[in-house]
Design a protein with these regions (language model features):
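Bacterial signal peptide processing site
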Residues: 15-18
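C-terminal motif of bacterial Sec signal peptides marking the signal peptidase cleavage site
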Residues: 10-13
Length: 146
């Protein structure tokens, strides 16, 4: 786990120093994870295919993890849905909200942010800086949205 985190931070650091424009195509989980780390978030208990519910189509796109950092002192489970492209995002986006009923025990505190073709969702409430860091990381990783 430490080695994975070190690789993500190293890659993110190199990208930050390159001064290049954001990618024109969506990035993968390593870039999103690096974006989280660059913005002061930490995460563990990463599970590929963990959509938070029994939706097979979402599970193919999902990664579940526990995250915290900045003003979010208590870890919270996040579900990251990495859709292949804009068309897949549009087709499956509403499924994320339906799936949330499985893990959001209080629908009033369900949180999500999206930047096509990505969605990050989970039980809340999320602290403001934490939410902003998630939004910034996935927006950067989304590039032009696939």
């Amino acid at each position: 786990m430490f080695l994975l985190l070190l690789v993500i931070v190293s890659l993110a650091g190199c990208a930050a120093l390159s001064g290049s424009e954001p990618a024109a195509t969506p990035a993968d989980f390593q870039v999103i994870g690096g974006g989280f780390v660059q913005r002061g978030l930490t995460f563990d208990h990463i599970v590929s295919g963990d959509a938070g519910c029994d939706d097979v189509n979402l599970a193919r796109t999902a990664i579940g993890l526990d995250a915290r950092g900045l003003d979010q002192a208590t870890p919270t489970r996040l579900y990251i849905y990495l859709f292949r492209d804009q068309a897949t995002f549009e087709r499956l986006r509403q499924s994320v909200d339906s799936c949330a009923g499985s893990y959001a025990t209080d629908p009033g505190t369900f949180e999500s942010v999206e930047a096509s073709p990505f969605v990050v969702a989970g039980p809340g409430p999320w602290a403001p800086q934490f939410r902003a860091a998630i939004r910034a990381a996935i927006t950067e990783a989304a590039g032009s949205g696939g």
